[in-house]
Every structure is written in C-alpha cells, then in structure tokens.
Amino acid sequence: AEGGAPLKMRLLKGCNLEMETVISSLRGWPNPILSTKTEVDANYLHILERALLPENAKALHIGVASHNLFTIAYAYLLSQKNNSSEYMTFEMLEGMADHVWRAQSQLGNHIILYAPVVKDEHFLNAISYLVRRMDENTAPDNFLTHSFNLKPGTDTWNFLQKQFEEAYHKKDSVS
C-alpha cells in the first residue's frame, strides 16, 4: 500500500546489437550503439558503479549479467566496498562458464542461472538466438572466446586484462 518496492535491473551488454541498429535506421532514430567495445565496456562499468551506490542499490536491485571474470570481480569488490552486495545478483547462462558461477556461489554470492525457452511456434526465434550467441561468443574481442583454459599471466589473460583496464579508465568519460 505504501509502495517502495525495489525495481530489478539486469545490466548486460552486447545483446541485440544488430537489431538495435536496424530498428533505429528504419525509424530514423540515431543509432544507440556505442562505436567501440571499449566504450560499451566503460559504459557498463559506469552504470554498475552508479547502481551499486548504497542509496541506489536499495531501490534498484541489480543483476550483473556477465561471464567476464574481470567484470564479475569488479562488481563483487564494488558491492563489498559499498555494502550493497545484498542487493546484487550475478546472472549467467546455464551451461556457459559453469565453473565461474560455482566459484561465485562458494563466495556466498547470489546467482541466477537462466536458459532461453520458446514455444514450438516460436522455434525460428530460438534459431536466430542461437546464431546470435554463436556470433557473439566467437568474436575475437569477446571474453568467452578466450575463457577456456584461461590462466593468469598468459598472453590471453594480459589481453583481457588490458581490455578491462582500458574500459575502467574511460568509465567516467562515457555517456
């Protein structure tokens, strides 16, 4: 009766990039997609930082949807620093990087695993979803492309760490 129920916001990136571009073009709108992966990552970190401030986290429960270890670690540390971890969940696709969510669970973090489900009449949507996931997950700058057998100190680790650091240093200058 008094209201005040928190909202749930799922923070993710890279989803439906092509469709956003097509729709904005068809409707004569400016393209909402940032021009580089670094800008997208920086914007994600910027929004995450704002969402996990104590005064925001209580009203806006945030789902950190990512398989990127650097992003997950940043969210974890930020939520600890801000005492806002009780208002945050980590969200991951079932069957993708299961070792990551298991480790998060052992730390006591709240985990939501999800899997796409469609009715028979929407099966074509499932095919397009799978094709999009395969395209995203095999892109050279996508974390999951490099995540198997990832070890600290390797060239791959250093590449991914550099990606994260570049985004981190730009997080306060993106819109």
PLM regions and their residue ranges:
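Positively charged, amphipathic and often flexible ligand-engagement surfaces
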Residues: 1-175
